[in-house]
Amino acid sequence: MPFTLGQRWISDTESELGLGTVVALDARMVTLLFPASGENRLYARNDSPITRVMFNSGDVVTSHEGWQLKVDEIQQENGLLIYTGTRLDTLEENISLREVFLDSKLTFNKPQDRLFAGQIDRMDRFALRFRARKYQSEQFKLAESGLRGIRASLIPHQLHIANEVGKRYAPRVLLADEVGLGKTIEAGMIIHQQLLAGRAERVLVIVPDSLQHQWLVEMLRRFNLRFALFDDSRYIEARHDSDNPFETEQLVLCSLDFARRNKQRFEHMLEASWDLMVVDEAHHLVWSEDAPSREYQVVEQLAEQIPSVLLLTATPEQLGQESHFARLRLLDPNRFHDYQTFIDEQQKYRPVADAVTLLLSGEQLNNNQLNLMGELISEQNIEPLLKAANSNSGESETARRELISMLMDRHGTSRILFRNTRNGVKGFPHRELHQIKLPLPSQYQTAIKVSDIMGAKKSLEARAWDMLYPEQIYQEFEGENATWWNFDPRVEWLLGFLMANRHEKVLVICAKATTALQLEQVLREREGIRGAVFHEGLSLIERDRAAAYFASEEEGAQVLLCSEIGSEGRNFQFANQLVMFDLPFNPDLLEQRIGRLDRIGQSRDIQISVPYLENTAQAVLIRWYHEGLDAFEHTCPTGRTIYDHYYEALLNYLAKPNNQDQEKFGEFIDQCRQQHEQLKQQLEQGRDRLLEMNSNGGEHGLRLAEKISEYDNDTELVNFSLNLFDIVGINQEDRNDNMIVLTPSDHMLVPDFPGLPKDGCTITFDREQSLSREDAQFISWEHPIIRNGLDLILSGDTGSCAVSLLKNKALPVGTLLVELIYVVEAQAPKRLQLTRFLPPTPLRILMDLKGNNLADQVEFESFNRQLNAVNRHTASKLVNAVQKEVHAILQQAEGLVETQAKSLIEQAEQEADENLAAELSRLEALKTVNPNIRDDELEAIEANRQQLLLNLNQASWRLDAIRLVVVTHQ
């Protein structure tokens, strides 16, 4: 095409320069000025990477003054274009705009505009865009959204609870599973689901001081949720950025003490518009009708303001009924307003539980029992079900399950209280204790005597604490560099134990970080034993590295030495050898130590070795834990109660281990054991088995775990992810253990890829491997790297237009095919979850010049494999040659896509209407027999249904990508 001064062109390789103007010409070169960027470029007249900008009738163009013109007619005058049409701001007709006066900041957003402007993308990017649309659409519609991407084992009861609660509007529930069953993971899954679904955006997590780090780690490692830890300094720092510091972050974690201590701070917290609050260890909130504690009042006021509340607590049997009622009162004060009414109501549910037990037994039901069933489910005709349940046919089991489901719906608190026990959940290992009694070295004996004399004024508690850790006493007198490890027999025993168990991974836990560091040095220097250290002084990344070093099978550490605080929130199920170098002060910490290995998914029995020094507080404590509480070999739900009750007596025995009457101490142990047995029996009798059945999920939980497990083997995810990393420009380094190291490169599509750390990260597509390797992130469709990658591709114009060659001798050379990808979508607030029914859905059309749609006959992937790439310059020439034909095809395609899109929208409307109407009528029917269904929940479902149908009715479609395919024989 001949050049003329004033013509407008665009650079094929530097589209960010905007619209260029021809300002100089000679026989061989042409100069373009790009006013938007102030740049000049010199190009050869022949074969330059620039494209003439020519708009068509129907296009809207912008003048350099800012007004817009809808083009009706195009004329040429001396090689320059004049656009004539209607000015959109004044509606004047027959207004002319010369191309030289077009806005230089012009960008091409529509795929067809980019194609005609020569901004043609690579073929592989077009394919990636289509796949991204397809996969994203499929993921939105899956019912298990929010559960599939968690970095945790697929435990049925956890999945059931998370699925049941996570999909509710403003859930307010009590999670009261026994220790070790994963309440934190359940809460994390619910948070994850609520965030992904858009039901929550701002989350507040309140935990005890000692659990802050554990929560921070669990939320980040398992759910990729980056909480901001608020303490005094963070609060003060955030005040510089906002009047309300809590509004500077969406996900906030803090301690209960932090929330309680300062009135203004608490007011800021109340005003911060949270969507969801989680309170861990909620059983420590002290309440009585006359005098609720300050901590209880803090949580109560927050719970009144925040729509969704999760309380994590001990089991109801451990709490006692009054304390249990206090937690339920936080969730729904209108429903649980009077304690005695609550007790009376609970008694009424006894027949329901008995009926379920009867159905589960499989025995024939007598007339009295049949009448009882009829009374309990009085609003429905269940005669046919009762007959089937009592028959010997194959329908009996199905009928009994349906009756059980109906009875469960009537159970008072099963909708707001979830509680599982180890008895009801299978998969836990046995625990074996090995006590290693060792002599007390003379050096320690001397140090303890001196400490007794000098510490006479110390409190009983302080002296008891000192006596538990003789190496600390020794260092106090001999200095920090005193080499206690040279004579402490526990060190010799540990060396021998590790040498004898060379092929075992061993977790060693001690109270202090200094002890762990000193032991690692001794093991390394004396026997060359590879060890990693894990303590509170390390950063998250350093802890990850230590954990990964310990987890590695080849060249990994044999032993991981942890301090008490440093081990919080980390689990090492791949190991089964636990050494307690010393003992913690209370039963909760003891269970926490064992819980590092004793988790669901542990495949071997846990071996607990405790080397202890005779005639010391350690000897007292090991006997009390083992003989008094049976706390080593079994979980001890009574531990805290007995500890609190006998606290003073226990302190006396610990503070003076040498001066005790052995007979009296034996009686003390017997007393503790008897109380332990009595409490345990009371707990067992108080178990609500109906509640356990509902919390466990049964078959539903198992099916959910199996279904998610099937997604774990998704090869499409692996192929798509690697393709995405290639095109985005992320470096990939394959490791020989099914892991990949991702690092940013200098040529990425964006300078900072969201979700990818600057120093890179290690990923795996294998769930089990991610669980055994602390440093490996588990990649799923829900991982931020993949979700951000999808958003990056689909929110921009990457791959929105391309040109390819099809080598096919069965078709004439030059045959033109146009592949069009339309997207049908509707806009709605995220909380409505419109994408469950109509996600942005791609519609593919493959047109020939005769107006035939070949998409059904020619599948995308097989077609794509037959195509060859073409360079951008040649592609621009091909586009210019067939521009007229492409416009005609686009017009024909509009009619085709309209029919398909309307059908899709109607389907979505019908599905949404039926789905939400069914949910509403189910809950309305239940409300007649179960008062725990809240009115606001019913109102929200109906309001959502109306709003969803309105939004779906306004759904539209648009062209998202276009590809020209030209047939060649070469």
Curated annotation (Swiss-Prot):
Residues annotated to bind ATP: 177-184
EC number: 3.6.4.-
Catalytic EC class: hydrolase
GO MF terms, alphabetically ordered: ATP binding; DNA binding; helicase activity; hydrolase activity, acting on acid anhydrides
Single biological process term from Gene Ontology: regulation of DNA-templated transcription
Entries under PANTHER family matching the protein: DNA ANNEALING HELICASE AND ENDONUCLEASE ZRANB3 FAMILY MEMBER, SWI_SNF-RELATED MATRIX-ASSOCIATED ACTIN-DEPENDENT REGULATOR OF CHROMATIN SUBFAMILY A-LIKE PROTEIN 1
Name assigned to this protein: RNA polymerase-associated protein RapA
Chain's gene name: rapA
